[in-house]
């Protein structure tokens, strides 16, 4: 199994949970904020999905495409589905050698990193915010929540 397939499985083990949590956010709760300084549920979900896609585009040395014209008019489930599929395609496009390529992220985070580290940074970011998302959906009243990660 190539590095791309291994990473894709790791990505999906977390992203499938993220998408399940996003699916629990009803239209009436998209503007929910646990505190006045918190991101809204919609903003948090979009931030997670788009950031991972952008980091993966950089790691795959491909131009980031604007996937939606009107984010606020797109359902969270559609955002999750499209960003997940596009991120999967980028991961699948990478060869084992691509994982070692140096990616210049000086404008974004001030350094250059191997592509594999860029992907791991994206995963750390997703895991961090997935914890936030668990809190949001709990506070929306949901008690039937998925495990932190799902294999298979």
Task: State the predicted function of each range.
Residues 1-12, 78:
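Extreme N-terminal tail/first-helix region
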Residues 2, 75, 117-118:
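A ubiquitous short alpha-helical element
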Residues 8, 12, 16-19, 29-69, ...:
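Short, contiguous alpha-helical
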Residues 28-29, 97:
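Secondary-structure boundary/capping positions in well-ordered alpha/beta enzyme cores
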Residues 57-95:
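Helix-adjacent hinge/juxtasegments
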Residues 94-109:
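Acidic catalytic patch
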């Amino acid at each position: 199994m190539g590095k791309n397939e291994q990473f894709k499985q790791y990505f999906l083990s977390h992203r499938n949970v993220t998408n399940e949590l996003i699916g629990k956010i009803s239209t009436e709760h998209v503007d929910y904020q646990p505190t006045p300084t918190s991101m809204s549920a919609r903003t948090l979900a979009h931030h997670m999905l788009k950031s991972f896609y952008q980091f993966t585009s950089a790691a795959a040395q491909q131009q980031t495409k604007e996937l939606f014209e009107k984010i606020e008019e797109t359902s969270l489930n559609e955002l999750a589905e499209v960003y997940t599929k596009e991120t999967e395609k980028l991961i699948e496009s990478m060869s084992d050698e691509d994982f070692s390529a140096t990616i210049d992220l000086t404008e974004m985070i001030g350094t250059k990193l191997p592509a594999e580290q860029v992907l791991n940074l994206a995963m750390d970011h997703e895991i961090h915010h997935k914890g936030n998302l668990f809190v949001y959906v709990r506070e929306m009243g949901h008690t039937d929540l998925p495990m932190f990660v799902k294999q298979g």
